[in-house]
Regions:
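NTP-dependent nucleotidyl-transfer catalytic core
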Residues: 1-226
Length: 226
C-alpha cells in the first residue's frame, strides 16, 4: 500500500469510504489530499443522540486521577500564541475530563530555570551594578520589592539573549551566574524569587483573562532538589 504514489493511495482510501453514510462526499485531489464533506443529516442525528444521552454519551466508568501539564509559559517572557493555544486546549481537556467524573490535577509547569535566569541576572548587573545582590560584602536582608517591573523584565531577557549571541564574555558570565543560582547562591536566589513573583502575578492575570486556571504552579526549578 505504501509503495505507491500519494494520489493512488488517496484514491484507494476514497474508494473504501464511498458507501459510508457519514460522508456527503469524499474525493482525492492532487498530489494526494483527501477532501471530505460530512453528511449534515448524519451530524445532526449524531449530535442530537449525544444531547439526549446521559452525560452527552460519556461512558460510565470508575473515576481516574489525571494530571494534565499545559500552559508551559516561561517566566520573564510574554506569552505568545503557542502558549495561548496550549492553554485553551489544556483547559478544555481538563473541563471535559472533570465533566466525565475524573479527578483532574492541572499544572502550568513553568519554564523557570536554566540559562535564561543567568542571562537576566547578568544583564541586570550590567544595568544596575549598585544593587545589593551584586555586593559580595553585603550581609543584610534582601529587599522585598523587586528591582524591576514586569515590563522591564520582559525587555531585559530578549536584550540579554541577543547580547549573548555576539558577546562571548557576557555569555560566559551568564553561564557562571546560572551555575551559582543552581548551586544555591543566596543573592541570585533572591533575584530569582523576585523574577518568579513578578512573572507569576502577571501570568495569573493573563491566564485569568482566558478563564484558564491551574491547580499547581510547578516549574522546572521544582526538580532541582532531585
Amino acid at each position: 500500500l505504501y509503495h505507491k504514489a500519494p494520489i493512488m493511495i488517496a484514491n484507494q482510501v476514497v474508494e473504501s469510504l464511498q458507501d459510508n453514510e457519514m460522508f456527503e462526499s469524499v474525493e482525492a485531489v492532487m498530489p494526494g489530499f483527501i477532501n471530505i464533506k460530512l453528511n449534515s443529516e448524519f451530524v445532526a442525528k449524531y449530535l442530537n443522540d449525544m444531547k439526549e444521552a446521559d452525560k452527552y454519551g460519556c461512558e460510565n466508568k470508575a473515576p481516574e486521577t489525571i494530571v494534565i501539564d499545559y500552559g508551559g509559559a516561561n517566566v520573564a517572557k510574554p506569552l505568545h500564541v503557542g502558549h495561548l493555544r496550549s492553554a485553551v486546549i489544556g483547559e478544555s481537556v481538563k473541563r471535559i475530563e472533570r465533566f466525565m467524573g475524573n479527578k483532574v490535577i492541572s499544572d502550568v509547569h513553568l519554564g523557570d530555570w536554566g540559562l535564561q535566569m543567568g542571562l537576566i541576572i547578568t544583564e541586570l548587573e550590567c544595568r544596575k551594578p549598585d544593587l545589593v545582590y551584586f555586593d559580595e560584602s553585603y550581609t543584610g536582608e534582601y529587599p522585598e520589592e523587586a528591582p524591576f517591573t514586569i515590563s522591564e523584565l520582559e525587555e531585559i531577557y530578549p536584550c540579554a539573549s541577543a547580547k549573548s549571541k555576539v558577546d562571548e564574555e557576557f555569555k560566559e558570565k551568564a553561564h557562571q551566574a546560572t551555575l551559582k543560582l543552581q548551586s544555591g547562591y543566596a543573592p541570585y536566589t533572591a533575584i530569582w524569587k523576585h523574577i518568579m513573583k513578578v512573572s507569576v502575578e502577571d501570568l495569573k492575570k493573563n491566564y485569568g483573562n482566558l478563564n484558564v486556571d491551574f491547580d499547581l504552579w510547578k516549574g522546572e526549578s521544582d526538580a532541582q532538589p532531585y
